[in-house]
Amino acid sequence: MPTIQQLIRSERSKVQKKTKSPALKQCPQRRGVCTRVYTTTPKKPNSALRKVARVRLTSGFEVTAYIPGIGHNLQEHSVVLIRGGRVKDLPGVRYHIVRGTLDATGVKDRKQGRSKYGTKREKAKK
């Protein structure tokens, strides 16, 4: 604990909060252009081919973003919307692509949790 004299000499410094998604620059989402679309493998206990894209954002950052859902139509020069949210078993992937906006189509044949994958409601069959 500091003495009164030490506090007079220099006041207590505020603790700076470090953001988990700096490329968004305090915005909820950011637009960007895909520079590379590829698959990568997850960390040790898991095994898969995860779909990711390298995206150049309007904020000037180039980030790696995860493409959620089964199947996608993204390729180089696709314009996408990025939101925050990391993928735990992919190191360095701290952003998600928003499905159903701009060039990223929604997931086909999705029945549950549709809002997270940009899928419209199916018409009721008679």
From Swiss-Prot:
Listed Basic residues bias regions: 113-126
Residues with PTM 3-methylthioaspartic acid: 89
Cellular component GO terms held in the UniProt record: ribosome; small ribosomal subunit
Disulfide bond sites: none
Region annotation Disordered: where it falls in the sequence: 1-28, 104-126
Signal sequence annotation: none
Record bears the keyword Nucleotide-binding: no
Molecular functions (GO terms): rRNA binding; structural constituent of ribosome; tRNA binding
Claim: Ribonucleoprotein is one of the keywords in the record: yes
GO BP, sorted A to Z: translation
Keywords: Methylation, Ribonucleoprotein, Ribosomal protein, RNA-binding, rRNA-binding, tRNA-binding
Family: Belongs to the universal ribosomal protein uS12 family.
The protein's role, per its UniProt record: With S4 and S5 plays an important role in translational accuracy. Interacts with and stabilizes bases of the 16S rRNA that are involved in tRNA selection in the A site and with the mRNA backbone. Located at the interface of the 30S and 50S subunits, it traverses the body of the 30S subunit contacting proteins on the other side and probably holding the rRNA structure together. The combined cluster of proteins S8, S12 and S17 appears to hold together the shoulder and platform of the 30S subunit.
Complexes and interactors: Part of the 30S ribosomal subunit. Contacts proteins S8 and S17. May interact with IF1 in the 30S initiation complex.
HAMAP family in UniProt: Ribosomal_uS12_B
Protein name per Swiss-Prot or TrEMBL: Small ribosomal subunit protein uS12
